Amino acid sequence: MASTRRPIAARLAFGLLATLLGALACSACNSAAGTGTTQAPSAAQLLVPSEQAAVAKAEADVAVHLPKKAGQPAPTLPEGAFPKPLRAHQVVGFLPYWEVGGLTPDYGSLTTLVYWSVNLGATGSIVHSGQGFTTLRSGALGADTAAAHAAGDRVLLTVFSESSSVINSVSSHPTSAGARLAENIAPLLSAGTLDGVDLDIEGDSTADRPGFVKFVAAFARTLRALGPGWTTMLDTYPTSAFDPLGFFDVKALMRYVDQLFVMAYDMQNPGIASATAPLANADLNDAATLAQYASVMPASRIVLGIPLYGYDFPTENKYDGSPATGNPVAVTYSEIVAAGRAPVWDPVTETPYTVFRRKGHWHQTWFDDPVSIALKSALAARYGCAGVGVWELGMAGGDASVTAALLGGSAPVKLPLRATRPLIGR
């Protein structure tokens, strides 16, 4: 889930097509390196017709003038950016263990607060160590839970693993491991008066795909038997709805969980200065991702994940889409704002970036700001999604414009605590 943990399936899927996109984006600047004023393809020009229409409508929903040329000053989100409020929707915010006690979220602007995380063990048990577990057992989350509930927000507990051996183990013994996880997590939910579970299991093996479905099914059924009303959310990759060889079988998994949180970020090509969460481009992007998900499941059960961080790329030159000269480094939105550099706009991906020199070398930092977040919120609304969510709340630095962009002029949907939809496929 964290910016340092790129979804492996998404990274592999990006591959060659992302490289070709980067070459397209920077071909003009490389051929006319003295100007940097070449007209870039619009976002809609790189999409299929249905996605073009969704992007165009989302852009129309946000009252901001979007530059049409690469490198022009990035717009800011004005008050009244949504002349017609977006359809009321959910807003999900992740609170990692290192933020507990040092961050006071705007609970009134949330639907669900998600505590990240405790770790999954190889047999389906909860690992009783690590800072996430220690913080939970200390009771430190109690104040956040009480405040969230007072504001009408659900509070979920994330179970996390990116260990290939652990994921293979639970997928190889899915029925027992799924039931054991539910039996292990139920006392933690009861003790913390929590409303359900978020499964952040980041696998990369096709071989584990069918077993993981059975694991989730066993978990969901057992949890509902132990505590009717506890909800289950599952985190998935941008590519999962259209990748038949990927770890997540979305069409099968959706039968057993209440919502999917689509981690629609870390879609950049590390070899080219590029957006981590493009609204649109030639390969991975939010518009194509939502279109694919909506084709295999009800959009009303999709939460579009939005990053509150970006990546700093050391680059060959200052132009949009320059090749990188080293590995990108994650940087939070609040850190980018604190740096005080004026952002410019990329009309292909509809995201901002900054260009600067450090110790004699060019750098580009690509990220999401209130305008690009507003466009994503509008796009999710156009697709009829349940809502939007962010990784993670502390990265915003308390910027009220980020909250406004997520809400889209509407009050957040508030869900009944410990209430959930009937289990399909039971």
Q: Model-derived features: where do they sit?
A:
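N-terminal secretory signal peptides that target proteins for export/translocation
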Residues: M1-A10
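Bacterial signal peptide processing site
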Residues: S27-A32
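Glycan-recognition patch characteristic of GH18 chitinases/ENGases
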Residues: G36-P187, P416
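Glycan-binding loop/region signatures in secreted carbohydrate-active enzymes
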Residues: A53-A81, R301, I306-L379, A404-R426
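Alpha-helical scaffolding within the catalytic cores
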Residues: Y97-L103, S138-D144, R180-P187, S240-K251, ...
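Conserved, mostly hydrophobic/aromatic
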Residues: L113, L199, L260, L304, ...
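Active-site groove signature of glycoside hydrolases
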Residues: S117, A182-G211, V262-D266
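Substrate-binding surface in catalytic domains of secreted glycosidases
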Residues: T123-G139, D204-A339
